[in-house]
């Protein structure tokens, strides 16, 4: 490719609405242009990187035995009504009517369509296992699209769906996809972690997320630096921090805490560690035709509630936070001074694992400006129901027993689920087993955010000059920068010779023949992030040299002009192999 025949749309300034590095640099590098909120044009230089991501994804999916197909972006509402997600999905599902007043959606995902294919095409256990995948445009009507391609409304995604006759087959399909994802993100040249995760709105019983590690990541990841453990903070098990409950050492005592409604303020006033205080959170579950059930969830003062964990407890799937009116009715006081001692009406108490082993702790007195100190289970309160209801914290023991937890930020770029029979039972996707009896198919679902990968890769690979692409997904692997291409025959001949040699060697190279000044030329390619650069100038050529610089290198080095193509080709191949 020659730059004079390519579109290079670099900008000196980022748009005002660009908040994070990847959004700013993708616009400035001429990769994307905004059409509407969360919807982008992908210009030629951006599309080149997308195609490289797609190629790696496609190769690894094919290697894992998945079969490519293509499903429509527009889906009939009937399929979503069958699965139950027409009502469940909410306003993110873009719905519309055609001219005949039929309801349709723009697909944010394709579980319904693929299940429809399976129930019509798969009749026998002999046709399984089978795994179908596509790379297709999706649309989710995000309430607040932001961060460029990181949280767009329209995006490109690879989604795969496996169908098996039994749990053993599903486990094997899941393992193959998990391994394929590890290969994909390794080949993409990204630092990533596979973490145990919650299945969210897709549903299912078992899932892992793949996160690119970046300080700007929206998700918190709990991991153990000395072991293989990693989990989304929503799913990470929080072990009890107190092994055994100590015997009471204090009498229960009501203490004045004027104006101190927060655990931190109470601890400071009473001159006790924050870890001695209890945070009381009131939840409610509605009962048709009757008053709600009120739940008091008790956490240590320095811990935070994990709503995902709470929603999985018996009776709390559809919980909500209690209203202030309900809190006053059940506890006799507004929020800030709540506790389990002497409630006005019965409540169900759930204590976090750590709280269940505490002694002589401080709770709200259910009276404004008062708390109760020296509270103990068994003596002052009945033994509670105990559950893991908190987020893990840095320094907590790792659930695998091999170290302590650390927390990092991650950008989710892939997700694998074991769906089980969630969709096949709802939509009647059955097969005849070995004995001729109908059984629901067991499904797996496996997604990769193709366009999101670009943003995540940039968040992990940039400097003050611009993007630093991994070789595998750079729009070009190498740029040739001739000094005076339009003026010097010596430079032009040397540049053209190098270009021909590199092209013949299979290097994805662009020759900058625009005749720009060196400063402009270098700034453009550093912004775009091409990982390797050769500079050809008359002075160097007279000594038989050209200048090489890797995008991450602080200094340039001189190479023999007649060996430069072979040397750089080897560097690129080594980087891709690594």
UniProtKB/Swiss-Prot annotation:
Pfam families: HGTP_anticodon, tRNA-synt_2b, tRNA_edit. The gene is proS. It comes from the Bacteria. It is an enzyme of class 6 (ligase). Keywords: Aminoacyl-tRNA synthetase, ATP-binding, Cytoplasm, Ligase, Nucleotide-binding, Protein biosynthesis. Catalyzes the attachment of proline to tRNA(Pro) in a two-step reaction: proline is first activated by ATP to form Pro-AMP and then transferred to the acceptor end of tRNA(Pro). As ProRS can inadvertently accommodate and process non-cognate amino acids such as alanine and cysteine, to avoid such errors it has two additional distinct editing activities against alanine. One activity is designated as 'pretransfer' editing and involves the tRNA(Pro)-independent hydrolysis of activated Ala-AMP. Homodimer. GO terms for molecular function: aminoacyl-tRNA deacylase activity; ATP binding; proline-tRNA ligase activity. It comes from Burkholderia vietnamiensis (strain G4 / LMG 22486). GO terms for biological process: prolyl-tRNA aminoacylation. The keyword ATP-binding applies. Its EC number is 6.1.1.15. Belongs to the class-II aminoacyl-tRNA synthetase family. ProS type 1 subfamily. PROSITE patterns: AA_TRNA_LIGASE_II. This is Proline--tRNA ligase. It catalyses: tRNA(Pro) + L-proline + ATP = L-prolyl-tRNA(Pro) + AMP + diphosphate. Gene3D superfamilies: Anticodon-binding domain, Bira Bifunctional Protein, Domain 2, YbaK/aminoacyl-tRNA synthetase-associated domain. It is found in: Cytoplasm. PANTHER family: MITOCHONDRIAL RIBOSOME PROTEIN L39/PROLYL-TRNA LIGASE FAMILY MEMBER, PROLINE--TRNA LIGASE. Consists of three domains: the N-terminal catalytic domain, the editing domain and the C-terminal anticodon-binding domain.
């Amino acid at each position: 490719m020659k730059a004079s025949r390519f579109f290079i749309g670099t900008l000196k300034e980022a748009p005002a609405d660009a908040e994070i590095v990847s959004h700013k640099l993708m616009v400035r590098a001429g990769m994307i242009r905004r059409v509407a909120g969360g919807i982008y044009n992908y210009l030629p230089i951006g599309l080149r990187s997308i195609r490289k991501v797609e190629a790696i994804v496609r190769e690894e999916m094919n290697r894992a035995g998945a079969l490519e197909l293509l499903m429509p972006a527009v889906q009939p509402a009937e399929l979503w009504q069958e699965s139950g997600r027409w009502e469940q999905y909410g306003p993110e599902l873009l719905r519309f009517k055609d001219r005949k007043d039929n309801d349709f959606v723009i697909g944010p995902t394709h579980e319904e369509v693929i299940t429809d294919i399976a129930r019509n095409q798969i009749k026998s256990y002999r046709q399984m296992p089978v795994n179908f995948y596509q790379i297709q445009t999706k649309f989710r009507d995000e309430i607040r699209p932001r961060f460029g391609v990181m949280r767009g409304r329209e995006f490109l995604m690879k989604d795969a769906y496996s169908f098996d006759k039994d749990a053993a087959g599903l486990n094997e399909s899941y393992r193959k996809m998990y391994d394929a994802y590890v290969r994909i993100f390794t080949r993409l040249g990204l630092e990533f972690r596979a973490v145990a995760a919650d299945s969210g709105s897709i549903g299912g019983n078992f899932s892992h997320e793949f996160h690119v590690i970046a300080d700007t990541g929206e998700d918190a990841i709990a991991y153990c630096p000395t072991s293989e453990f990693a989990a989304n903070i929503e799913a990470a098990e929080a072990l009890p921090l107190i092994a055994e409950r100590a015997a009471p050492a204090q009498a229960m005592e009501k203490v004045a805490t004027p104006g101190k409604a927060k655990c931190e303020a109470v601890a400071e006033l009473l001159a006790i560690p924050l870890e001695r205080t209890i945070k009381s959170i009131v939840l409610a579950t509605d009962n048709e035709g009757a008053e709600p059930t009120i739940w008091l969830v008790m956490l240590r003062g320095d811990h935070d509630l994990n709503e995902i964990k709470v929603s999985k407890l018996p009776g709390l799937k559809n919980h909500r936070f209690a209203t202030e009116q309900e809190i006053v009715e059940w506890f006799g006081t507004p929020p800030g001074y709540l506790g389990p001692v002497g409630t006005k009406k019965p409540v169900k108490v759930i204590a976090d694992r750590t709280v269940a082993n505490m002694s002589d702790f401080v709770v709200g007195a259910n009276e404004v400006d008062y708390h109760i100190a020296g509270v103990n289970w068994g003596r002052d309160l009945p033994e509670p129901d105990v559950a893991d209801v908190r987020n893990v914290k840095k320094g907590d023991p790792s659930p695998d027993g091999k170290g302590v937890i650390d927390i990092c930020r991650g950008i989710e770029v892939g997700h694998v689920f074991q769906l089980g029979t969630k969709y096949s039972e709802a939509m009647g996707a059955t097969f005849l087993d070995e004995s001729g009896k109908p059984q629901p198919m067991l499904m797996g679902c496996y997604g990769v955010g193709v366009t999101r990968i670009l943003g995540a890769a940039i968040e992990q690979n940039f400097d003050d000059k611009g993007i630093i692409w991994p070789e595998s997904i750079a729009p070009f692997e190498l740029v040739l920068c001739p000094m005076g291409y339009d003026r010097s025959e010596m430079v032009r001949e040397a540049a053209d010779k190098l270009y021909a040699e590199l092209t013949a060697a299979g290097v994805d190279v662009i020759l900058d023949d625009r005749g720009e000044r060196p400063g402009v030329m270098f700034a453009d390619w550093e912004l775009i992030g091409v990982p390797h650069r050769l500079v050809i100038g008359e002075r160097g050529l007279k000594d038989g040299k050209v200048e090489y610089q890797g995008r991450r290198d602080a200094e340039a080095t001189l190479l023999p002009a007649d060996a430069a193509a072979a040397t750089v080709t080897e560097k690129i191949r080594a980087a891709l192999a690594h």
